[in-house]
């Protein structure tokens, strides 16, 4: 099996590319960074530091690389069985024309073996968005052929890849946490389903997208907000504070109760998933700053995001939410010299008061009981 992966950055090399190469797939990276391309083509291998309770070094081998803006990448798309991406949501649109050219070439060469394309980005249904960009770049006479022979497969990805703490200047060396999750929508594949260790197939992708948002993202944000208020520097320091840990774990259990009601997740398995995430926050190798994780509080307090969306779920199913309320109050206190949203939040609260400010940011009813609970918690933290 042959694969082309767009994006030879830390996530590309340390997560998706590693899983593909470890599965024995013939892998080519596509990127614009000439230093990385030259190093990959000179060595055909690189080292990945996998850090958890212990550290191990894995070698990924048998890889090569091409420029993502040349003709080679177009030729490869005409030949490979799988295309994956880890380029960041904004860059998907930029790689679409090259993919479209490659698909036209594939059609012209009469290659009708199925091709599947999977965007592995931190966004909801990223491949569907990539498909839209590719379709816009295709000539009309190629669109029906692409619909028939090319699968655009959505996925959910989760692995923390911190800034490398390596003492070397090796452009290929990368550090990743032990945990990784790559869940793909099996209903969208063309041809046989691939068997790639570390890739999980599901017919209910949105359940897993929400599970990550309501657990990892909710817990991470609340740890950051309460940690900053308590004077902690890192996520690890904050989660080792018993008072903060109790609220974070409680909030993840509250959001988890929503997931169990909504999607039928197994309660014991979800409790184990929460424990695993608490362990990830404690990882001594991931020096995650509370200020970095807390950034953009207006976005994180919006209706569809990690704090308000699970709260709305607790209201929908009449479930408890006192710890989620503590997290929301903590977010309202977030102040950072370097974050424009933190400054805007402070100005809004100063101008309108906490009740009207929270209602405006979150879309919650200003006169609702939950807004009143959040304001009470906010004032108690002052």
Curated annotation (Swiss-Prot):
GO terms for biological process: mannitol catabolic process. NAD(+) binds at residues 3-14. GO terms for molecular function: mannitol-1-phosphate 5-dehydrogenase activity. It is an enzyme of class 1 (oxidoreductase). Keywords: Acetylation, NAD, Oxidoreductase. The keyword Cell wall biogenesis/degradation does not apply. This is Mannitol-1-phosphate 5-dehydrogenase. It comes from Escherichia coli (strain ATCC 8739 / DSM 1576 / NBRC 3972 / NCIMB 8545 / WDCM 00012 / Crooks).
